[in-house]
Amino acid sequence: MKSLIVYFSRRGENYVVGNIKEGNAKQAKTIMNAISYIESEGKLDEDTIIVTHDSVRPFVTHRILEENIRYAKEFGACDTVIPATDTIVESKDHQNISCIPERSTMYLGQTPQSFKAKKLRDIYLNMTEEELASK
């Protein structure tokens, strides 16, 4: 990660890099911990972007990170996706096929995922415990 930190610093961007820690089993708790850290450092405002990434896909390019940040700034959130190559089958009752969506319109979400941190915090704070437990 050090090379990415130096790379973004040279571009004059204002990035806060906190301690990199092992995530919690629940994504929502991990993200809220990161947002709380940013807030405790006095760096949480309307323009703060949080980028989440998992260790399953350790090799992320500068281009993907830059695009995530740019689109999160513009649209409020950005998900890295790849086209689905397998057929996706929906089963609402877990026994019968309910729907087979058109593959050409399906994508698989990956990481990084990027968000306006304050907006994401507000969404999480308005979720029920049951909703948070499922995230």
What is the meaning of each model-derived region?
Residues E22-A25, S55-F59, I64:
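Active-site-adjacent loop/tail segments of enzyme domains
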Residues K43-V56:
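Short beta-strand-to-loop acidic/aromatic patch adjacent to the donor-nucleotide binding site
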Residues Q27-A28, H53, Q110-Q113:
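Glutamine-centric residue-chemistry signal
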Residues E46, F59-K135:
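Conserved core of the sugar-phosphate nucleotidyltransferase
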Residues A34, D54, K116:
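Residue-level signature of catalytic and energy-coupling elements of molecular machines
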Residues M1-E46, E130:
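Conserved N-terminal catalytic core of the sugar/cofactor nucleotidyltransferase
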Residues G23, T52-H53, T80-V81:
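Generic beta-sheet signal
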